[in-house]
């Protein structure tokens, strides 16, 4: 009985500590950063036309960067331009969006365009706000299914190691890592089911986020330009092998 009481007491302490850290992470005074609509065009005027659509959250609106050209998918589009593509970008991303938001408001607008390339970067807010992973997977299934029907190629960004976020402190950081990993597994399954490609945010990308303090912006949550470069590298590694097939 004594050991059981001890375990119960320890559990209460852990839960209480996590709750305190969560409140601290949300309420501490940090700067609010500008966001961008990174729609636009890049590449030679006589290049191969390529329409890219973006479904996403703040990872695609760029709080933490100085200008839209530093956002990860704009960096990818610059590499496509170097390959001779004339890239037209239509971003439907909204900061704070969950998978349900993307499904309800972003997908209908995007699928009407019949894009050549679709980037899907939602799910992190689902993970952060404790949306059941079954719900996340169901929403992603529908998002990816609908976009693969109209888009020649679909890339799913996934969820990275949220435990690297400086705003979080232990033990919340460890919990964020575990839940982020589970969320990414859900994204990988959904991508595979529908023939989409998936970026790897848990290899070199996660290591960079863990070790490079310049990755994060002043709000200690969103990545700065170096973080977007890491994301662009991960997306390009997944995308580049498929370019000659399109």
Model-based region annotation:
Residues 22-28, 63, 90-92, 128, ...:
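N-terminal start-of-chain detector that recognizes signal peptides
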Residues 55-56, 157:
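Short hydrophobic segments within beta-strands
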Residues 44, 81-84, 148, 190:
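A generic structural signal for short, solvent-exposed coil/turn residues
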């Amino acid at each position: 009985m004594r050991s059981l009481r001890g375990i119960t007491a320890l559990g209460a302490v852990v839960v209480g500590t996590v709750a305190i850290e969560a409140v601290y992470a949300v309420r501490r005074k940090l700067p609010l950063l500008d966001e961008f609509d990174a729609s636009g065009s890049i590449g030679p005027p006589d290049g191969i036309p390529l329409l890219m659509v973006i479904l996403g959250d703040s990872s695609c609106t760029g709080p933490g960067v100085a200008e839209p050209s530093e956002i990860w998918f704009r960096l990818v589009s610059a590499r496509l331009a170097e390959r001779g593509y004339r890239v037209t970008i239509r971003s439907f991303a909204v900061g704070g969006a969950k998978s349900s938001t993307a499904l309800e408001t972003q997908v209908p607008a995007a699928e009407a365009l019949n894009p050549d390339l679709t980037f899907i970067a939602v799910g992190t807010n689902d993970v952060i706000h404790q949306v059941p992973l079954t719900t996340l997977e169901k929403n992603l299934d529908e998002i990816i299914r609908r976009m693969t029907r109209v888009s020649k190629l679909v890339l799913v960004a996934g969820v990275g190691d949220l435990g690297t976020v400086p705003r979080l402190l232990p033990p919340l950081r460890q919990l964020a890592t575990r839940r982020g990993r589970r969320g990414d597994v859900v994204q990988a399954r959904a991508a595979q089911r529908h023939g989409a490609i998936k970026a790897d945010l848990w290899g070199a990308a996660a290591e960079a986020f863990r070790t490079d303090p310049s990755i994060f912006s002043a709000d200690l949550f969103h990545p700065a330009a170096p973080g977007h470069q890491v994301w662009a590298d991960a997306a390009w590694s997944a995308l580049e092998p498929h370019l000659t097939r399109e």
